[in-house]
């Protein structure tokens, strides 16, 4: 559990530091961050959310569009695992 918390915090730091570089694309980066972070309500989703945050934080440096796609996929997977009321809407 401590390892997952550490990984999650590393992902958050990366996404915060990269968002300053993309200040002109603030709307896209905010949308990307929101998509990546949604993914769960319920028992099985915290791991998916943690992995999504880590991957999203790394991918913000390579492309906002890629981060948005990963976030959308994460939301769909979270919705499928947790039922119709969970995930990104």
UniProtKB/Swiss-Prot annotation:
GO-annotated biological processes: sorocarp development
UniProt-listed InterPro entries: HssA/B-related (IPR008455)
Pfam family, one: Coiled
UniProt similarity note: Belongs to the hssA/B family.
Protein's name in the database: HssA/B-like protein 10
Encoding gene (name): hssl10
